UniProtKB/Swiss-Prot annotation:
It catalyses: N-(5-phospho-beta-D-ribosyl)anthranilate + diphosphate = 5-phospho-alpha-D-ribose 1-diphosphate + anthranilate. Mg(2+) 2 binds at residues 228-229. Its EC number is 2.4.2.18. Pathway: Amino-acid biosynthesis; L-tryptophan biosynthesis; L-tryptophan from chorismate: step 2/5. SUPFAM superfamilies: Nucleoside phosphorylase/phosphoribosyltransferase catalytic domain, Nucleoside phosphorylase/phosphoribosyltransferase N-terminal domain. Anthranilate 1 binds at residue 83. Anthranilate 2 binds at residue 169. Catalyzes the transfer of the phosphoribosyl group of 5-phosphorylribose-1-pyrophosphate (PRPP) to anthranilate to yield N-(5'-phosphoribosyl)-anthranilate (PRA). This is Anthranilate phosphoribosyltransferase. The gene is trpD.
Length: 342
């Protein structure tokens, strides 16, 4: 087993850690066996060298080992819409809104998320304002998935080992490997995923990581405007993993009949504003907010293997919104989470 000192010297020299070495090192970090100085040095060493696909996959594997898992009785069409965040765009909660639409279309959405990192509100912030009980046990989240096809996994409830790293990350104030691990560590082990990323380089990297981790159908996306979603401002970069193969391409919103818009049309400066925009979309209000939700929900439906193509996914998303079923999913989650959580 590699020592922290040897690992750090390897990173300083610009050399990659082997997969098994990264596994061992990450387990030490997650158990709190390294000093804060050692952990901080290794995290920054990885960042400066630039984390490799193998290193990220090993770290994600360990985080999954240490996570509190959600029991799921039916794994068909199980999808997550969790992105990295960190795009500093201050848009409303697009992926959270899309989750309700995808669930209404028949996907089983195991939504993983937390509080705000760099935006005005994270998924947990807006769901809490809507009245969803976040403090459910893993078994209760599994019950939500079984009964209504939608469950929210509040990250701190499932990744308690992060307590060893959280103060170090806060004190560093810099991005580390942990900024990209969240969407790779779904506690329900969803192997279908729509993941937005904050940097274009991560599109190819995360798709290869998820291939190593055994995912089935995934789209990793990054908008030309920096958005960690499929954007309406112009083309989005996409890496799609399906049947063990990765295809990289650009996706234009016009291909699906959506007009271009600017990021300011999607802005929400507070969690309350984000909640209001989410509700407006679910209530059927037309405009850019609805359009971007349709596009991203369509992608989630497609990656869940409910729809045979992204275009068909968008059509199903539109039907789910127009029928009122997406709004009903929100109401069902509020009611069931409150009932289960007492």
């Amino acid at each position: 087993m590699i020592t922290p000192q040897a690992a750090l010297n390897r990173l300083i020299d610009g050399n990659e850690l082997f997969y098994d070495e990264m596994l061992a090192l990450m387990r030490q970090i997650m158990r709190g066996e390294l000093s804060p100085a050692q952990t901080a040095a290794i995290l920054i060493g990885l960042r400066v060298k630039v984390e490799s696909v193998s290193e990220i996959a090993a770290a994600a594997t360990v985080m999954r080992e240490f996570a509190t898992h959600v029991p799921v009785s039916d794994r068909r069409h199980l999808v997550d819409t969790c992105g990295t965040g960190g795009d500093k765009s201050h848009t409303f909660n697009i992926s959270t809104t899309s989750a309700f639409v995808a669930a209404a279309a028949g996907a089983r959405v195991a939504k993983h998320g937390g509080r705000s990192v760099s935006s005005s509100s994270g998924s947990a912030d807006v769901l809490e304002l809507l009245g969803v009980n976040l403090q459910l046990t893993p078994e209760q989240v599994g019950q939500c998935l079984d009964e209504i096809g939608l469950g929210f996994m509040f990250a701190p409830n499932h990744h308690s080992a992060m307590k060893h790293v959280a103060p170090i990350r806060k004190e560093l104030g810099a991005r580390t490997i942990f900024n990209i691990l969240g969407p790779l560590t779904n506690p329900a082990a969803a192997d279908h995923q729509l993941m937005g990323v904050f940097h274009p380089d991560l599109v190819g990297i995360q798709s290869r990581v998820l291939k190593m981790l055994g995912s089935r159908h995934v789209m990793i996306v990054h908008g030309c405007d920096g958005l960690d979603e499929l954007t309406l401002s112009g083309p989005s970069m996409v890496a799609e993993l399906k049947n063990g193969e990765i295809l990289e391409y650009e996706l234009e919103p016009g291909e699906f009949g959506f007009p271009l818009c600017e990021l300011k049309d999607l802005r929400a400066d507070t969690a309350a504003q984000s909640r209001d925009r989410l509700l407006a979309v679910l209530d059927g209000q037309p405009g850019p907010a609805r359009d971007i939700v349709l596009l991203n929900a369509g992608a989630a439906i497609y990656t869940a293997d409910i729809a045979p193509s992204l275009a068909d996914g968008v059509t199903m998303a539109r039907e789910a919104l127009d029928s009122g079923k997406a709004k009903q999913k929100l109401q069902q989650l509020i009611a069931l989470s409150r009932k289960l959580g007492g």
